[in-house]
Amino acid sequence: FCGFFALIIVGIPTLTVIQANRRKMQYLPPRVSIEGRGIKRGLTAVESAILMEQPLDKVMTMILFGVIKKNAAEVVTRDPLKIKSASPIPDGLHEYELNFLRAFKEESAKTRRGLLQQMMVKLVQLVSEKMKGFSRRETLDYYKAIMEKAWQQIEAADTPEVKSQKFDEALEWTMLDKNYDDRTRRVFREPMYAPTWWGRYNPTHIPASSKPTVASAPFQTSGQPVSSSGRSALPGADIAAQMVTGVQTFSSKVVGNVNTFTEKITGATNPPPKPTSSGGSGGGRSGGGCACACACAGCACACAGGGR
């Protein structure tokens, strides 16, 4: 029996640590989980990602793609990641997109990270406010269906041009897929045309034509239909790989340790409950600890007052 109880003694602290780490990643306030009625329509893909509690480095990559597609920014260098805002800033950007661009005006990595944390706190609070009175479960199902439909349209495209167009239109929605990395690599095996905004995301991209193209000219409108005129068909695997590494770039080059970054957000939006004290106020924890002395074979270790 000693081995069994030793396993329990070792296992409980390990499980506690795992649960504590998982708790730090849950940045949505508890009230969002209180079931209301009906679907909250009108959320953006980024807001839907927050509702799904997607990793925050992925959420910020979605914001990056959003401002690039809207001609509000371009990537100057990938390593280190430097972003140049358009001048003037286009109308119609969301507050979180404006805050994102403001953060990247800062040269200091520490200052930029702090501003990105503030941006994420405001975004989580915004989604929490929008979800008041609505069903999170029904809303999640609704946006997961949108995500799946976006992928189906891309997968059903019968030409590289159509596939590129569908991908361009639905990029942020496809990123809601938990298997985004694998699915992107699987779907884009054949050659495809780079999205019209590709030159603003990939500063090393050289268009096939020597003439200025939509893909190479910064801050040109990206709402034009996809055309192969003046654009090169690139290996789909290359495009897929660069989309996936965009998330990895945010993790390693901008956010740093994503767990530490997220923990700071959670501390502001979903802080852990304050411990309640019962009984005496001695140096140890009252009523919540479990001190077992397991001596030898056949002993029974009884923990009183420590269970939940």
Residue positions per predicted region:
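Acidic, Ser/Thr/Pro-rich intrinsically disordered cytosolic tails and loops
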Residues: 1-308
